[in-house]
Amino acid sequence: YIHGKTGIDIHPAASIGRSFFIDHGTGVVIGATAVIGNDVKIYQGVTLGALQVDKSLANVKRHPTIEDNCILYANSTILGGRTVVGHDSVIGGNSWLTESVPPFSIVLHQSQVKVRTKPFEEPVNFVI
């Protein structure tokens, strides 16, 4: 019911600390064994998910731990039960994280778009 109203999926077994804040929550997914510390902020499209799904893993920690005072920006994906985001860290938008990062980390996704690799033979005139 609530997913239909908010677009947010938080498994009821997830552990969430005090002063947890979701801004623009559409697309947020928080798995069953996720642990979120105090004073954590997350933005739209963030996934705290598992690396794999199997019935044999039902009683195993499959989702990440986010320690206190972290910010997870839009569309960041953090996967795995052994993945820990250390306290006071920032995970930038569109980041993909499957390994732990220490406290006070800043993780960024940098897209590299190469438009052209060889120089123009003549000057290019653009008319706008």
Task: Annotate each predicted stretch with a short phrase.
Residues 53-54:
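PLP-dependent aminotransferase-like
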Residues 1-6, 119-128:
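Terminal amphipathic alpha-helical/low-complexity segments used for targeting or macromolecular assembly
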